[in-house]
Amino acid sequence: MALPPFFGQGRPGPPPPQPPPPAPFGCPPPPLPSPAFPPPLPQRPGPFPGASAPFLQPPLALQPRASAEASRGGGGAGAFYPVPPPPLPPPPPQCRPFPGTDAGERPRPPPPGPGPPWSPRWPEAPPPPADVLGDAALQRLRDRQWLEAVFGTPRRAGCPVPQRTHAGPSLGEVRARLLRALRLVRRLRGLSQALREAEADGAAWVLLYSQTAPLRAELAERLQPLTQAAYVGEARRRLERVRRRRLRLRERAREREAEREAEAARAVEREQEIDRWRVKCVQEVEEKKREQELKAAADGVLSEVRKKQADTKRMVDILRALEKLRKLRKEAAARKGVCPPASADETFTHHLQRLRKLIKKRSELYEAEERALRVMLEGEQEEERKRELEKKQRKEKEKILLQKREIESKLFGDPDEFPLAHLLEPFRQYYLQAEHSLPALIQIRHDWDQYLVPSDHPKGNFVPQGWVLPPLPSNDIWATAVKLH
């Protein structure tokens, strides 16, 4: 059974276009109609939920022949209404590309042609205003137009890539050409010598000449580009560029090496500073430990004296307690009516005085012994401090002498490298004569005193306290003549 025509005479037309469905949660709203976003095509309503599927016809081979009446719109069985299939609908609005993407990827409207009778071709819409596109999209569009105006239109996919012109001979090519020419010259030189020797033998001479001719032709071919000024100039420019690049690389390598050496020197200086700090900390700890040991030794030596002093104090307390006890017993006996004789009191008092004198002598002896021990320990501690101070001063003096020797070696050269008979020895003796002769010192000071000026003089300065070191070399030529340490 044939299907009835889609639109008959009494059948209503397609429904009006419905507004697009609301965007899902979190998606931007669909854009308004514009050249970049044409309105969606109307679709045939179907039983499918949501957007309906487009109306598709069966293939032409499966369609029955339609009569003229049916073609003119009449109804009847076994005929189709000759309606062309509508184009495929565009993707959903939320999946459309942004209006700032590449023009090659931007969807274009369908080509002009007969559309469905119920869907006339949409009119050309004007460009969307700024408030429709948004500030970000409008700025993006302006940036793209500016880039195209400055740098030209970007090359589309499939466009032929312009071929780069030959930039000139490479150094490898020139080197290979020169090496081949040098080999040919060597062979021709050998053949020339052989030709001179084979002048008497005509056949051998002809054979050698036949070998020489192609070599000469090849040599002329090899040397022909070298006669062109442009070829030679380009080769020289490339060679100069390579030379400058190598110089830059060497300079950078030299700078990196100097940086590494400076970093190594800084690391050595830091290590030396750390070592000095550690030595100082160790010395402080050792000094404190030594003081504690001396104090412990002094306490050990003085412990016996202090013990004896404690015994004398205890004996004094015992005598005081005995005197108090006798007084209490005497009072108790007096209450009972018993009175001791006066001789007993005298004897008791005599013994107490004798014991107090003995304890006093012992106490004075122990105090003198303690003072002697303290003086002895303080003397030992003072000697130890003097030895430490002398050792420190000796180290400082050695350090100063080493620095002085280093400065003198920079000024006058290393004495190990320059013996006494060297040409610079008189100058060394002249500049160091004040260290060995008092008249020379007085004369030098007198010469310096001639330049004394008041302290408020604008050009006055102090006499240098040490050697005036020379400045660094001002150029490379002078640096080659100076040995830097």
From Swiss-Prot:
Pfam families in alphabetical order: PDCD7
Location(s) in or outside the cell: Nucleus
GO biological process, one term: RNA splicing
Coiled-coil region list: 232-335, 362-411
Keyword Protein biosynthesis on entry: no
Alphabetical UniProt keywords: Apoptosis, Coiled coil, Nucleus, Repeat
A Gene Ontology term for the protein's cellular component: nucleoplasm
Record field: compositional bias (Pro residues): 12-48, 82-96, 109-130
Region (Disordered): 1-133
Disulfide pattern: none
Residue stretches of biased makeup (Low complexity): 49-71
Function comment: Promotes apoptosis when overexpressed.
Quaternary structure and partners: Interacts with RBM40. Component of the U11/U12 snRNPs that are part of the U12-type spliceosome.
Name the UniProt record assigns to this protein: Programmed cell death protein 7
Originating organism: Homo sapiens
